[in-house]
Swiss-Prot record:
The chain crosses the membrane at residues 7-27, 114-134, 145-165, 189-209. It catalyses: K(+)(in) + H(+)(out) = K(+)(out) + H(+)(in). This is Potassium/proton antiporter CemA. GO terms for biological process: potassium ion transport. The gene is cemA. GO terms for molecular function: antiporter activity; proton transmembrane transporter activity. The keyword Transport applies. It comes from Daucus carota (Wild carrot). Belongs to the CemA family.
Length: 229
């Protein structure tokens, strides 16, 4: 019976690791055509409301400069001007297409991640027994470690996530999550998140050391502070 529970728990752990990837891949493919049709049939007019975006403005300014150039060369042949108008029209359609594809990409990835979160939450609730078994294994493993080893791992993880050299790692991690949700790259937002998250984690960790470790294992706190110094 215990072997069966152990196998079920390990299978549950493996499914938690691979399930998000499978859900994302499946829903991306199944929702892509629906989101594209919905956007193209009902939301195409939003383009003209969102045209204030900087990258779209920049491209249309370039087109305006071409139009000014057209005015300057009116004495040129009518055929040349007609070709110029056709080129501007094609470029405008291309800008609209790129803009719409960006919006579809954002909606698709955001929807997929929300669905993935809901499914994983329900899966975690249904697999509560397996989570309890995995938690007991983890606690037993950690309990059997010496205080020195525990302090070493705590120091390593804190330096890795909230240490002086962790900024670049946070930039990559937050940038990956930000991109995975389909949002366009924004240096100001990413910089703000990189500044906020390590501070919050550092505060929570110090509070945990003060409230929990001091009560459970004072010797571990002493070793940790000695190694940290």
């Amino acid at each position: 019976m215990s072997k069966k529970k152990a196998f079920t728990s390990l299978l549950y752990l493996a499914s938690i690791v691979f399930l998000p990837w499978w859900i994302s891949l499946s829903f991306n493919k199944s929702l892509e055509s629906w989101v594209t049709d919905w956007w193209n049939t009902r939301q195409s007019e939003i383009f003209w409301n969102d045209i204030q975006e900087k990258n779209i403005i920049k491209n249309f300014i370039e087109l305006e400069e071409i139009l000014l150039l057209e005015e300057m060369i009116k004495e040129d042949s009518e055929t040349h001007l007609q070709n110029l108008r056709i080129g501007i029209h094609k470029e405008t359609l291309q800008l609209i297409k790129i803009h719409n594809e960006d919006h579809i990409h954002t909606i698709l990835h955001f929807s997929t991640n929300i669905i993935c979160f809901v499914i994983l939450s329900g899966y975690s609730i249904l697999g509560n027994e397996e989570l309890v078994i995995l938690n007991s294994w983890a606690q037993e493993f950690i309990y059997n470690l010496s205080d020195t080893i525990k302090a070493f791992w705590i120091l390593l993880l804190t330096d890795f996530f909230i240490g002086f050299h962790s900024t670049r790692g946070w930039e990559l991690m937050i940038g990956f999550v930000y991109k995975d949700f389909g949002f366009a790259h924004n240096d100001q937002i990413l910089s703000s998140l990189v500044c906020i998250f390590p501070v919050i984690l550092d505060t929570l960790f110090k509070f945990w050391v003060f409230r929990y470790l001091n009560c459970v294992s004072p010797s571990l706190v002493v070793i940790y502070h000695s190694m940290n110094e």
